[in-house]
Each structure stands twice: as structure tokens, then as C-alpha cells.
């Protein structure tokens, strides 16, 4: 029963964030046998001005496999990017979880292979909780496996320091 194979994709940002030393840029392949994937080492990171939008950063070349938390000040945004490839695309529902409920702004953008937006989710502790896709203290985003390849962009802003 495929509906039993829901995957929770966890981004466990210990404290506020965790400094990732692993190489990124690899695709995350999800099969029906996957039950949990820690994405932290598979994300490319970019620190930008707070005013930059998705269209501004999509084609930038400065993405890094890690970031230094003290580079992310109140006037900056931290962007993350990774690619999901579904082994057997179908209508199965998956979930991306950002595991830090203290972040002020967490935005998730899902794009198809032609860079068309499939979904966008604007969440965070400073936003209205009733607009979240799931009533939960963590930031949970649904991801459909109907597309074989999905690029995920994650933007985080926080008025406090990134530790």
C-alpha cells in the first residue's frame, strides 16, 4: 500500500541552524522504500540581501555546500536549494519538515523542471499560524511526487542571530 510510504523529509536545524560540512549539489533520490531522509548535507546555501526574491537568486552561481551562521545578520536571508528526484513518480504525498519552530520567516518554493512554481508556502513564527499547510509547531510542507524532478528553494529570515 503506497499510502503507507509517507516520507518525512527532515531538516533538523539544531539550535537555530547547523553548520553543514558535507558536499551538496547532489540530487536527493526518493524511492518507495525511503522512510526518512536528512537533507542537511544535501543542501546548497546562499546568503543574500533580505530584499532578494526567488526570481533574483535562481540563476546565481555563488551557492555553497555550507554557510557560516554569523554571516546571516538581520538584514540578510539564508537561501537553501536542493533537487528531489522521485524514482517512481505517482500521486504519493511527501513532507518536508523544518525542525526549528523559533524561526521568524520560513518560505518554501517548489519548482518543476522548467522552473515553474508548483507551490509556495510562507510560514514562520512571525506569520499567522492559521495559514500553514498543517497545524503543527514545526514548519511542514507537502510535496507531491506527481513530478519526477522538483527543485526546492528554502528562504529563512530571522530577526535574532543565527547560531
Go through each PLM region and give its residues.
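Bacterial N-terminal signal peptides
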Residues: 7-16
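Positively charged n-region of N-terminal signal peptides that target proteins for export
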Residues: 1-6
